[in-house]
Amino acid sequence: MQNRNTYEWTKKMTRLISVLVMIHIITRTSISNAYPIFAQQGYENPREATGRIVCANCHLAKKPVDIEVPQSVLPNTVFEAIVKIPYDTQMKQVLANGKKGALNVGAVLILPEGFELAPPDRISPEIRQKTGNLYFQNYRPNQKNIIVIGPVPGQKYSELVFPILSPDPATDKEAHFLKYPIYVGGNRGRGQIYPDGSKSNNTVYSASATGRVSKILRKEKGGYEITIDNKSDGGQVVDIVPPGPELLISEGELIKVDQPLTNNPNMGGFGQGDAEIVLQDPLRVKGLLLFLASVILAQIFLVLKKKQFEKVQLAEMNL
């Protein structure tokens, strides 16, 4: 009986711990690491009419990103799209709780219509090894040509390999043998602004009024309440600084409106780029190969004919 009670207690505790772990993962992801989710929730299309990728609305710092794709691909073929997000992996960023931690990365890949993420059974072992344990998803269930990834650890995945399947015009009437553009956006680190317009703790905080700093209160859970004696109306203004940024001002200091109260803790940033890829017609490739073969054969026959002519000339001279 006692063994049975112990078993039931252990079973309940295991369930409780599992639930707590899941809650922690969900809340931590949604607060500090969920930048692809923010874009998916807020925008029908990640690329605006101006060509700007919407991730730049939250990630204000501009950083480089690069994409490598083959110059051309055949229909119904799996190929690699490599997105490179370079940064110093030794850097630490401010997390949502104000502590320092490693940077994570994410990317959105906007392919031409008809191109999509390769199904698992079409991915070769070589490409599978390069993609690692990455989990790719479509931006929308009906937008298979737009793929998002992240957040993932930047120290391990500063180079992301997307396995892509090209369309086949023989079965897809919307696909054509043309040159197509591919767009990519990639970021490292957390954003500075949330989709609702509020600031994260990964950005600089500025004074909302001109006056003297009369009080700086350090909050119990981190962050500051800064009281400013407003010079214009004689009242007081309280600016809230969350945990993370470091103060640049002190009590008694005269400050101006929009003057930075803190440093800028952001270590990351967003970048976007593009590339071109040609969906090549196999018949055109075969035709080109036949043409090249005919040119080579013509050259060989010309050389042989020339040698034969030289032999005839030499024989006539000897007569």
Curated annotation (Swiss-Prot):
Gene3D superfamilies: 2.40.50.100, Cytochrome f large domain, Single helix bin. SUPFAM superfamilies: Cytochrome f subunit of the cytochrome b6f complex, transmembrane anchor, Cytochrome f, large domain, Rudiment single hybrid motif. GO terms for molecular function: electron transfer activity; heme binding; iron ion binding. It is found in: Plastid, Chloroplast thylakoid membrane. Binds 1 heme group covalently. Heme binds at residues 35, 55, 58-59. The keyword Signal applies. It is a single-pass membrane protein. GO terms for biological process: photosynthesis. The keyword Zinc does not apply. Keywords: Chloroplast, Electron transport, Heme, Iron, Membrane, Metal-binding, Photosynthesis, Plastid, Signal, Thylakoid, Transmembrane, Transmembrane helix, Transport. The 4 large subunits of the cytochrome b6-f complex are cytochrome b6, subunit IV (17 kDa polypeptide, petD), cytochrome f and the Rieske protein, while the 4 small subunits are PetG, PetL, PetM and PetN. The complex functions as a dimer. PANTHER family: CYTOCHROME F (PTHR33288:SF10), PTHR33288. Component of the cytochrome b6-f complex, which mediates electron transfer between photosystem II (PSII) and photosystem I (PSI), cyclic electron flow around PSI, and state transitions. Belongs to the cytochrome f family. This is Cytochrome f. It comes from Pinus koraiensis (Korean pine).
